[in-house]
Curated annotation (Swiss-Prot):
Function in brief: This protein binds to the 23S rRNA, and is important in its secondary structure. It is located near the subunit interface in the base of the L7/L12 stalk, and near the tRNA binding site of the peptidyltransferase center.
Name used for this protein in its record: Large ribosomal subunit protein uL6
Source taxon at top rank: Bacteria
Gene: rplF
Keywords annotated in UniProt: Ribonucleoprotein, Ribosomal protein, RNA-binding, rRNA-binding
Database matches in PROSITE patterns: RIBOSOMAL_L6_1
Pfam families: Ribosomal_L6
Length: 178
């Protein structure tokens, strides 16, 4: 048995989980998410818990067992509490501002960079150097934050660029002068 997959998922008050064929729909106070289930995996809801099972012990079924359980648990947490990622902008002249739903970033290029939010993800700005990416889908929030970070990764000599708030940038020593 998968150690992760065999654990039941508690359904909190205010969250509803429905299984329709190969689709699991999870609805909560912040919204609803849908998850397609693989053929080898079975999902059942009984007395306030979600149980994930598998049909056989093949390698793919074992892998999908734990994955499916983790995805359902993430969706249950997302529709109840939501997910946020915080990014910081470090560097002279580097700043961010919000134009409607979009972000406008000044990253040292000759032009501003605009970032459109993906569906289900919203952007927030604190000051002119902090970006807050939030939403109910953990994967969408992580991908949106990673795509913003990718625009200007933190460089190791001065540390300027876009970084996660909890990220530690390894610094290198510059070349020694004479």
């Amino acid at each position: 048995m998968s150690r992760v997959g065999k654990l039941p998922i508690e359904i909190p008050v205010g969250v509803e989980v429905c299984v329709n064929g190969r689709t699991v729909s999870i609805t909560g106070p912040k919204g609803s998410l849908y998850l397609d289930i693989a053929e080898q995996i079975g999902v059942s809801v009984s007395d306030g818990k979600v149980l994930v099972s598998r049909s056989d012990d093949s390698r793919t079924a074992r892998a999908l067992h734990g994955l499916t359980r983790a995805l359902i648990a993430n969706n249950v947490h997302g529709v109840l509490h939501g997910y946020t990622k915080t990014l910081e902008i470090v560097g002279t002249g580097y700043r961010v501002s919000k134009k409607g739903e979009n972000l406008e970033l000044a990253l040292g290029f000759s032009h501003p960079v605009f970032v459109d939010p993906v569906p289900g993800v919203s952007f927030g700005v604190e000051g002119n150097s902090k970006i807050i990416v939030s939403g109910i889908d953990k994967q969408a929030v992580g991908e949106a934050a990673a795509s913003i970070r990718k625009l200007s990764k933190p460089e190791p000599y001065k540390g300027k660029g876009i970084r996660y708030s909890d990220e530690i940038v390894r610094r290198k020593v510059g070349k020694a002068g004479k």
